[in-house]
Design a protein with these regions (language model features):
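N-terminal nucleophile
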Residues: 1-146
Length: 146
């Protein structure tokens, strides 16, 4: 149950505001595994003053979330740039290439920043563990093991 998961919680929070979260941001991402398959999800509160009809990065497969048999990822940040480079897909492709989750997250964010110059964060879960990376203030991450 949740008591077991909570007992294995690792908090990787960095760049938090005094309230424990970044002001005016409420995106939540999750990646999970049942031991055989991976699933990823990302939810966002949207963007103020967006153009009518804009489709953000969150609902786009490969951008806000992505999974293969090797693992999954969820990302948030500069939405148009995340969509342009399909950040979550990029992170999972690194897992497919055989590198670990933390290295996949680090490499994906390094490539993202090099290509776009923008800020983002990504969480990654693979068969060997979890990782996260970001290049912007206000990203909080936690890992729960059952």
């Amino acid at each position: 149950g949740s008591d077991q998961a909570g007992s294995g919680l690792e908090n990787g929070s960095q760049g938090e505001s005094d309230s424990g979260r970044a002001p005016d941001h409420d995106t939540v991402g999750a990646v999970a595994s049942d031991g055989e398959r991976f699933a990823a999800a990302t939810s966002t509160g949207g963007r103020s003053f967006a153009l009518a009809g804009r489709v953000g990065d969150v609902p786009q497969v490969g951008s806000g979330f992505f999974c293969t048999e090797a693992g999954g990822a969820s990302a948030t940040g500069a939405g148009e740039d995340i969509a342009r480079v399909t950040l979550s897909r990029r992170a999972v492709e690194h897992l497919d290439d055989g590198i670990g989750a933390q290295a996949a997250a680090d490499r994906a964010i390094e490539e993202f920043e090099e290509i776009t110059g923008s800020g983002a964060g990504v969480i990654v879960l693979g068969e060997e563990g979890a990782g996260s990376a970001f290049n912007t203030d206000g990203m909080q991450t936690s890992i729960a093991y059952k």
